[in-house]
């Protein structure tokens, strides 16, 4: 099936522009819909808070409002010890300018992995260093360095409060090159030492256990996203046990395992991380937030989807821990059932994935990387149960990712990303659209060529599905998940989704 000439419609912003009065009204109501959307600095105390802070409400003329925690810190405010701004959820990019910045933020996460510089990051997007910094400051209100420093400090603050990691381990996990630099910047920015903060929190140092929380906005359909991953996991590298998700992880040279479970009382996911992954905790957290779509805002999504979302208002769009991992899984699932594709995916891990030790017998291998699959002859790939054409497609995708002909990190256009992927022989619009929807994390993505979506909408043409979905902008990806979910409830999923 060919493309249907989808045009890029103007995206609506994630929120209408708010003035100080509206910010203050949201603060007064402690409205959770705005948690992470803005922060309030209290001029009399020089402390900044989340809008849901349980502390006594400050007078309006004492308040200053910021879009980002980093902007509040640059203005001289330090984080509240009660509402803990480091636990606030983030926001998904919607409009075109935000998509460029969103891609840049994904690359900032990668910089933590690969030690890239800001000029190198700017060059990736074909911008001058000066223009790139100016664009980020315009959108975010802070420089890239200021943003990264705040992210590191807030993670350190969370680890000091919630874990029993040593100071050296916390400095490493937060992205600092030395304990001295960590102590110096923390004390400079927050006006107390890391040791003093830990003492005040009543959390002593004793061991390398690392368990922390990642917040979300309610409602959150944990059962739905867990069911989705349970049916599509890489056996040997992932598993779902009851209400928990487990997987092996490799980021750079760091390898280990994680477990994730829902903590509904705290509106967060509880994550346990192997000690060997502490050095890459910042990029790991970013990947987990994308994987579980933790930055979604259910209320505006539900309002836009109307009756479509009534039965499942907290449904999330499953993301990607790794772009190639999702791409490979999509290729393995072409023209066969989900169950059959899951069997083949397990064989791929068993045959080509590197072994790893873990405390869980179900976790014994890594999912192969693009470079590892690219090095495997097509004849070898066929031995896991692939046809020659499918094996060639998988090899072609692996080469394209390895050679950076397909780059999921700096993608700023849904249409361009789909076009790049369809240049690989064997990857058509449906496969490319599905990969882009999960990997790029764009709320308005809609793979209209999908037969399941067409069936749920009672149409026979992709163009008709696209036209009907127009009313759900800018949340069409969530509409797609709701439509697939409706078919699953009716036991009418097409073969490639069942």
Where are these regions (language model features)?
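HhH-family (HhH-GPD) DNA N-glycosylase catalytic core used in base-excision repair
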Residues: 3, 7, 12-498
């Amino acid at each position: 099936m060919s493309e249907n000439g989808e045009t890029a419609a103007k995206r609506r912003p994630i929120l209408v522009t708010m003035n100080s009065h509206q910010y203050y009204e949201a603060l007064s109501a402690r409205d959770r819909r705005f948690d992470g959307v803005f922060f309030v600095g209290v001029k009399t105390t020089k402390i900044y808070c989340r809008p849901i802070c349980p502390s006594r409400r400050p007078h309006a003329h004492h308040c200053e409002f910021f879009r980002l925690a980093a902007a509040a810190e640059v203005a001289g405010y330090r984080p509240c010890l009660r509402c803990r701004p480091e636990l606030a959820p983030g926001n998904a990019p919607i409009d075109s300018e935000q998509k460029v910045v969103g891609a840049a933020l994904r690359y900032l996460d990668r910089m933590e992995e690969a030690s890239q510089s800001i000029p190198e990051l700017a060059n990736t997007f074909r911008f001058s260093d000066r223009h790139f910094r100016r664009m980020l400051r315009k959108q975010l209100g802070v420089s890239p360095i200021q943003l990264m420093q705040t992210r590191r400090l807030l993670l350190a603050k969370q680890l000091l409060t919630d874990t029993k990691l040593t100071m050296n381990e916390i400095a490493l996990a937060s992205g600092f090159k030395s304990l001295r630099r960590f102590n110096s910047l923390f004390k400079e920015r927050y006006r107390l030492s890391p040791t003093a903060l830990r003492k005040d929190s009543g959390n002593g140092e004793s061991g390398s256990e690392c368990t922390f929380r990642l917040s979300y906005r309610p409602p959150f359909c944990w059962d739905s996203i867990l069911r989705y991953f349970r049916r599509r996991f890489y056996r040997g590298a992932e598993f779902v046990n009851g209400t928990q998700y487990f997987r092996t992880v490799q980021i750079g040279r760091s390898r280990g395992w994680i477990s994730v479970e829902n903590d509904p009382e705290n509106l967060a996911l509880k994550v346990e991380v192997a000690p060997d992954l502490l050095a890459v905790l910042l990029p790991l957290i970013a990947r987990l937030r994308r994987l579980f779509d933790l930055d979604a805002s259910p209320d505006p999504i539900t309002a836009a989807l109307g009756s479509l979302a009534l039965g499942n208002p907290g449904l999330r769009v499953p993301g990607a821990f790794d772009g190639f991992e999702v791409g490979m899984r999509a290729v393995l699932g072409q023209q066969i059932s989900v169950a059959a594709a899951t069997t083949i995916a397990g064989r791929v891990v068993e045959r080509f994935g590197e072994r790893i030790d873990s405390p869980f017998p179900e976790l014994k291998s890594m999912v192969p990387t693009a470079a590892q699959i690219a090095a495997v002859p097509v004849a070898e790939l066929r031995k896991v149960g692939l046809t020659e054409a499918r094996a060639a497609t998988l090899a072609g995708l692996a080469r394209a990712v390895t050679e950076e002909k397909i780059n999921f990190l700096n993608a700023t256009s849904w249409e361009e990303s789909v076009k790049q992927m369809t240049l690989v022989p064997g990857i058509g619009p449906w496969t490319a659209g599905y990969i882009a929807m999960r990997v790029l994390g764009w709320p308005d993505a809609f793979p209209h060529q999908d037969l399941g979506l067409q069936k749920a909408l009672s149409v026979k043409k992709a163009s008709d599905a696209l036209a009907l979905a127009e009313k759900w902008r800018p949340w069409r990806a969530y509409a797609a998940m709701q439509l697939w979910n409706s078919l699953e409830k009716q036991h009418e999923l097409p073969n490639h989704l069942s």
